[in-house]
Amino acid sequence: MYKLIIRPILFCFDPEKVHYFTFSLIRTIAKIPGFTSIFKSLYEVNDKRLEREVFGLKFKNPVGLAAGFDKDAKLYKELSNFGFGFIEIGTLTPKGQEGNPKKRLFRLQEDSAIINRMGFNNGGVLEAVERLKKNNGVLIGGNIGKNKLTPNENATSDYEICFDALYDYVDYFVVNVSSPNTPNLRELQEKEPLTQLLNTLQNKNQNKQKQTRDGAQSSGAKPILLKIAPDLTNEQLLDIIDIVKTTKIAGIIATNTTISREGLQSINRIEMGGLSGKPLTNRSTEVIRFLSQKSNKAFPIIGVGGIHCVQDAIEKLEAGASLIQLYTGFIYEGPALVKAINKEILKKSL
């Protein structure tokens, strides 16, 4: 029904307006008595064999929702009813910011893709924290970044602010230095500044662990992951492996959006921003395979980028991903994709 009726209607309108309309619609429907149970019965696959333990966390299934869909933690409870094993919120910054000027989100229907240049639009980390205080059982990842006006030499401070604010309310962290839509952000992917940033967060992580142990509770350090671009060279990817081992972060999310426009058909290919969707499928899988093989599977990888069908998901898992995430594929294919992937994982005993 989604692809035949709902998607054609939604795709007649501006993508960003549709996004917020969909948010309001899901929130409204979820308030109707009984609808939560209906959603779960339609989209959830409850099977112990789907459970995964990765970087010390227990996931009810390996299919998550990628960051960017629920930036401000406004809908994570409702979205979890679509069968996701975990929800990643963000990217969040210390201060709320409008992001880049509109129009900044574009469909490329001929390519089953999206280009966005949103620019970390969000209400600020503290607003999200207030919503996360009401969380009851949804496994949450916190994707953090820097404000647009913060110069790179002060970027670490922004990440620290977000880390401190979210620490008690998310299950894992994602350091986002790979978005192409914040000026100069990708420069932080270079080995020296990235190592410094991650070491700072890890030191803070360990200190928080000690403080917790001295107090009434003991929850341990939170897993910190790094989200990388698909546009890195093999040499840069080898640097990433070294950085993970040196800083002892928990793992990698591969990959973010790409600045490549190779092979695109849509007229919207001329738009600036990060490309996501089907054109990214093969490259993100290549990056996952490279990292897994060259590191000897030394750390977990969350695979994301161009998962539009069951086979796309299986290929990423077979390439070395421990978990996977959807975003653009969820928009193009609808919520039934989550259930289909989980059922195929069971079928293949992955």
From Swiss-Prot:
Subcellular location: Cell membrane
Cofactor (UniProt): FMN
Listed pathway(s): Pyrimidine metabolism; UMP biosynthesis via de novo pathway; orotate from (S)-dihydroorotate (quinone route): step 1/1
Active site: S179
Residues involved in FMN binding: A67, G68, F69, D70, K71, T91, N143, N176, K227, T255, G277, G306, Y327, T328
Membrane topology term: Peripheral membrane protein
Cofactor comment text: Binds 1 FMN per subunit.
GO molecular function terms noted in the UniProt entry: dihydroorotate dehydrogenase (quinone) activity
Bilayer-spanning residue ranges: none
Gene Ontology terms: biological process: 'de novo' pyrimidine nucleobase biosynthetic process; 'de novo' UMP biosynthetic process
Binding residues for substrate: K71, N116, R117, M118, G119, F120, N176, N181, N256, T257
Keyword Flavoprotein: yes
Function: Catalyzes the conversion of dihydroorotate to orotate with quinone as electron acceptor.
Quaternary structure note: Monomer.
Record protein name field: Dihydroorotate dehydrogenase (quinone)
Record organism: Flavobacterium psychrophilum (strain ATCC 49511 / DSM 21280 / CIP 103535 / JIP02/86)
